[in-house]
Amino acid sequence: MAETFEFQAEISQLLSLIINTVYSNKEIFLRELVSNASDALDKIRYESLSDPSKLDTGKDLRIDIIPDKENKTLTIQDTGIGMTKADLVNNLGTIARSGTKQFMEALTAGADISMIGQFGVGFYSAYLVADRVTVVSKNNDDEQYIWESSAGGTFNISPDNGPSIGRGTKIILHLKDEQTDYLNESKIKEVIKKHSEFISYPIYLHVQKETEVEVPDEEAETVEEGDDKKPKIEEVEDDEEDKEKKPKTKKVKEVKTEEEELNKQKPIWTRNPQDITQEEYAAFYKSLSNDWEDHLAVKHFSVEGQLEFKAILFVPKRAPFDLFETKKTKNNIKLYVRRVFITDDATDLIPEWLSFVKGVVDSEDLPLNLSRETLQQNKIMKVIRKNIVKKALELFTEIAEDKEQFDKFYTAFSKNIKLGIHEDSQNRNTLAKLLRFNSTKSGDEQTSLSDYVTRMPEHQKNMYYITGESIKAVSKSPFLDSLKEKGFEVLFLVDPIDEYAMTQLKEFEGKKLVDITKDFELEETEEEKKQREAEEKEYDGLAKALKNVLGDKVEKVVVSHKLVGAPCAIRTGQFGWSANMERIMKAQALRDTSMSSYMSSKKTFEISPKSPIIKELKQKVEADGENDKTVKSIVQLLFETSLLVSGFTIEEPAGFAERIHKLVALGLNLDEEPEAAADAPAADAGVAAAETSDNAMEEVD
């Protein structure tokens, strides 16, 4: 008895999109179904390594493609792991994968439908060419079942009492009238060669061949039998010849079904790299990754000696949509042992920061019966991992030699490089050479750290950088002024991960990396030193007064020679968070608040003795004292504007807004009390405004 199930809502939407699509490259359905068949074969082969009896239901691991022109069906059959009834219900309809929604969003945004495999929903591409799909599946742990749907919102599942398929899955596509081209032998061969030539299992196409065979000619025999009844003329000489008379035959055409292997090519990684064309690498990359674009770069190498393995590593042109999804298992490197697929889930084979690299590794030394647990402990795996990282870095360095290629690479994977600097202490310095940043001297282009070093003036000891939310924000920062005056270049770090990377890197080619939003010592001449000491002495009283007014809001107030145009700014201590890091940490939903209070910045309020505002404020404090209302108001306003310009947020934005509004009112000669101003005669308005202007700043608190 067939059971009817409803498709999950998102899958129904996806099917509707696929059925009504106008995409011309519908051939990708075959790539997806063959790829799924290969995955199913991988699974049963892996299980059989620990339990050989799993293959008792069929040792021949293969994929068959069977076109039937008479019934307009195309069948793709594998001898893989097969699906239980529960698998059929869940995998083909009721449970949406994480990629379903993302794929629909990508489709509606104009992405190509050939991306479907990357989102884990490749099976549904069958509906590009079929109006009805039947799936027959047999798993070792369950009976044989049939799944069937015309994608109308529901699907049926029933026990299959027909011929047993042993183990595996048979997908029967009932083709649309306009898609019967996919029943032609030449078309199927073309699509398989293009997309699936490097699948690890043999793909057999069932082709009908017409041959001529000789069969007994029964009609001729009948005629001869009739001749026997006629009177015989005796011939003595030919007695022996008559005895040896052969039966008569005729030639007839017979149609036989033959199996033709479509992917006889041996594994590409076992071949000499010099014999492999770029087209072959591109075809292999696409079959490996489900990408519809060619790769950006490839590294094909073998390691020999105490340890032997071959590998091919590919760098894609784009970052995948789920590159930094922590819960998703990364299966970009397929591990083989002596050409036998073991797993694509060997997390220890490649570090997380390299998770965008795709490829295969084929080891001669690992045991075939490896479990995922023993993989993690295996010493050979550690050596393979070290070599993969080394070769990947060589590949990135090669890409860097071509600016156009490297720009594409860096746009897509700069975050991975920075994550590598943060996590991989051994390769930190090599990775640092790949970093690119905008700077005060680079214009619209980005500069490398090596190029920065070549431009450093002789008297510059350190390399300087500033962190912030955007290039627009940091390029106007008051912290840049004194360094620009000295001709020192400053790097702009505006990616949230930049600061994490720099705190681990610390130095480059012997030069210390310095964050100019934190306390640091700026190179100075003897004359500059004398001037600074004199100004510190002169403004020491003002600094103490401002500290008293601001209290615990700042750790200290200092006279600064690092500010030029701005009257004041707020710098943080060497060991706490910078303003930028504080902003990033506050945005973390699951942040540790106790850690935040411990690490939050110790603020230093810097005042510039060169600023007319500070000079005037000094006189005001000396004349009226630090407790004067106007002094307190001015100091508070200067502090809050410094917070903003230095990259911090204001804790009480309403109070800040009120002070700004009072200042605006003062500039416009407006009365503080609008109702009173409205009641006053027009002639008195000017007098009221004039009186207000003298008192307004005193009331700004």
UniProtKB/Swiss-Prot annotation:
CDD domains cross-referenced by the UniProt entry: HATPase_Hsp90-like (cd16927)
Q: Where does this protein chiefly localize?
A: cytoplasm
Which terms are listed as keywords in the entry?
ATP-binding, Chaperone, Cytoplasm, Nucleotide-binding
| A Pfam entry, by short name | HATPase_c_3
Quote one Gene Ontology molecular function term. ATP-dependent protein folding chaperone
Q: Where is the composition biased (Low complexity)?
A: 677-691
Q: Which domain of life is it from?
A: Eukaryota
Subunit info? Answer: Homodimer.
What exactly does this protein do? Molecular chaperone that promotes the maturation, structural maintenance and proper regulation of specific target proteins involved for instance in cell cycle control and signal transduction. Undergoes a functional cycle that is linked to its ATPase activity. This cycle probably induces conformational changes in the client proteins, thereby causing their activation. Interacts dynamically with various co-chaperones that modulate its substrate recognition, ATPase cycle and chaperone function.
What is the name of this protein?
Heat shock protein 90 homolog
The organism of origin for this protein: Podospora anserina
